Amino acid sequence: MRNIKLSLVAFAAALSILSPAAHARAEGEAAPLDAKTTALYKRLVALNASIKSYKADVHLDVALKTFPYISPSLDGNVYYKKPDKETVVFDTVPALASQFKKVYPKVDPPGRWLALYDVGVLGSEDGATVFRLVPKKNGRVEHLDVRVDEATATIKAYAWSYKDGGTVAFDQSYTSVGGAFLVEKQIGHVDFPSYKADVTSNFKNYKLNVAINDKVFADK
């Protein structure tokens, strides 16, 4: 069994390309946060404040578009512990599980954005605001665009752009558990020069505020 780091804001999962309108915005310059977008960002940070930890079942369907062109399904558990510990443990052999470590980029919690990124706004459309996050530390990621629902302050989509020309994008939908908004499904696409895949993830059986040993989050 292999621990695979990912951000559930994510899971983390599962990836689908943003709408053409969102891509058009992504080509423009990001504007600084104003009073309205700052208020939305604060709501996003405060979302699910009562949740200290959770565990959930996850089912992952992958369709590789590059060699070896397989379409495996994996099951496992996703774990979260405040403030920013997240991981997925797949119920499969380490060799197979390790192949999907690259599927999920790390997603930092919104409360960490201002420390890690230069945060701006690309625009608002169809009831959603797109934030652009540019890493302050030099690395593989050029920027990350995050689409936030203005009514619920939930993240509807992520889109990473990498310096090597690769992209990772996914849309996600939510379910309500104990008054909290938690990811129920993610659908998306991974596109790197040497690795391409369509990914769908489904989450269920959330258990909130349970005890989780920190060893679960250690790389193995």
What are the language-model segments listed below?
Residues D126-D219:
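Gly/Pro-enriched, hydrophobic low-complexity segments
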Residues T38, P68-N77, K163-A169, A197:
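Amphipathic hydrophobic-ligand
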Residues M1-L6:
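Positively charged n-region of N-terminal signal peptides that target proteins for export
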Residues A22-A63, P83:
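N-terminal leader/targeting segments and the immediate start of mature chains
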Residues V9-L18:
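Bacterial N-terminal signal peptides
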Residues A46-Y54, Y69, K82-P83, A151, ...:
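Edge/loop elements at the starts and ends of beta-strands within beta-rich repeat scaffolds
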Residues A63-S124:
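An acidic-aromatic
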Residues R43, D75-K81, F170-V177:
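Extended lipid/amphipathic-ligand handling interfaces
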